[in-house]
């Protein structure tokens, strides 16, 4: 993996994604080379046990939203937005919960990396996001400062918004009741 580095004043940053499927090691070593200089960094890693979740939705919904065609269309449709590496930083401070009705992690319905089983079909997959449970009339807020790079409909995720926060960091908001922003 070759990360993209972003200069911000006298600092240089790179976001390095680490998949939940990577084999566990107590550390990951990075070798960074720039203009003839080599630096080695070691990142300590904490082992995580991902929980399992049985998800009860109908076969009709699964065939409409979770079939191979919908998944492939989502991946293909979103690829250009996630490939873009905005060189400007739009974020600062800490991430916020995406709704004022969310007060703590008890509002998380499904966490990142959870082993999910669709009980109607037995299909298993890893969950690639974080699902928050909010009321249908609750406003959804951007978790970080940024610019909207996609606002529209996707078969798998319904009404969807993608926000670019800069430096390759993006958030995706899916299954929305309505959209009141534009690109």
Predicted regions and their residues:
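Short aromatic/hydrophobic contact patches that present stacked aromatics
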Residues: 13-15, 129-133, 162
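Cationic-aromatic interfacial patches
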Residues: 1-49
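A generic structural motif
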Residues: 31-33, 133, 164
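Surface-exposed, glycine-biased beta-strand/turn segments
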Residues: 43-157
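Residue-level detector of beta-strand structural context in well-folded domains
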Residues: 2-3, 30, 130, 138, ...
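Zn2+-dependent peptidoglycan hydrolase active-site motif and core
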Residues: 142-180
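Acidic/histidine-enriched ion/cofactor-binding microenvironments in catalytic or ligand-binding pockets
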Residues: 137, 182-183
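Short acidic/polar mixed-charge low-complexity motifs
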Residues: 37-39, 138, 167-170
